């Protein structure tokens, strides 16, 4: 976003936000601030779909579903007004685990794109599964030879540009560039 603004580029970025219904209020506030501050250069896909989400908080279920219509009385908060729901996605079905991968292909086709790159903001320091995503030895399908990319579908790739950032890198960048951030991290620091 900073690069687009500094170089006065005439491009828009699609932002895919999987709204999980149950999130910290500070996280929701941060997402809303970022969307509002950048609406001139981003197209927002705020998705409120009852996709399967793995959980270890139940002895009876291996997954839960945010925004499940049949459990609307139990929703933690109202659905955002600008949300896209399951009716917006012809590929959605209740059995799928790979919603975000299918979304990438859907947006590629919808935009009639030549190539699509989805930027994913994960850091390998945060979890072993994230580390495996980048360093898996059997990683055959990358964009050119960039190890921090993965092919999702024909001409659709995920890229992980901050995969090697450490926690200190994140805070150094925030301090240097005065980026907005989720103030929930201030509470974690205390």
What are these regions (language model features)?
Residues 1-190:
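Nucleotide-activated chemistry modules centered on ATP-dependent adenylation/adenylyltransferase
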């Amino acid at each position: 976003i900073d690069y687009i603004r500094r170089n006065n580029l005439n491009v828009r970025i699609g932002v895919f936000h999987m709204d999980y219904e149950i999130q910290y209020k500070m996280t929701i506030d941060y997402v809303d601030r970022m969307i509002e501050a950048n609406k001139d250069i981003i197209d927002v896909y705020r998705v409120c779909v009852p996709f399967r989400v793995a959980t270890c908080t139940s002895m009876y279920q291996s997954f839960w579903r945010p925004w499940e219509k049949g459990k609307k009385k139990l929703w933690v908060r109202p659905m955002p007004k600008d949300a896209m729901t399951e009716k917006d996605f012809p590929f959605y079905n209740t059995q799928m685990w790979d919603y975000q991968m299918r979304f990438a292909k859907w947006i590629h086709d919808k935009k009639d794109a030549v190539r699509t790159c989805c930027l994913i903001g994960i850091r390998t320091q945060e979890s072993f599964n994230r580390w495996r995503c980048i360093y898996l030895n059997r990683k055959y399908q990358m964009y050119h030879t960039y190890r921090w990319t993965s092919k999702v579908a024909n001409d659709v790739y995920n890229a992980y540009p901050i995969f090697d950032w450490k926690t200190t890198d994140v805070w150094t960048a925030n301090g240097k560039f005065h980026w907005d951030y989720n103030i929930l991290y201030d509470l974690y620091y205390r």
